[in-house]
Amino acid sequence: MLAMVVDLRISPMDTKELVRVYRDEVVPLAREQRDFNGAWLLTDPDTGVGISITLWDTERHTGEIEGFYDEKVEKFAALLTETPVRKHYDLEVIA
C-alpha cells in the first residue's frame, strides 16, 4: 500500500476552512479515485501546520494519483502560506 503524505502550511486562522475544504471537497473527490483507501488530515491550529495522509492500494496508478494530488491542492491553494511538501511512503504495518 502507498501512503502520500503532504506537509501543509497555512495561517492559523484558516485551519477551520482547511478542514472544511478537505472534508467537503477533497475527500469526496478522493473517494472517486481508483485504489483510494483512506484519508486523514492532521492540524495544529496554533501554528497552522497541517499534514494530509492518503492511502492507496497500489502504486500501479501513480500517474493518476499525481493528477489527483494536483487537483486536490488547487482546492485549498488560496489558504497556503508555503508550497506543500509531498512524499510517498510504503505502508508496512497497520495495527
Residue ranges of predicted features:
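Glycine/threonine-rich phosphate-binding loop and adjacent beta-strand/alpha-helix elements that clamp
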Residues: V73
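Short S/T/G/P-rich N-terminal loop/turn motif that feeds into the first structured element of a domain
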Residues: M1-I51, L55-D70, A78-A95
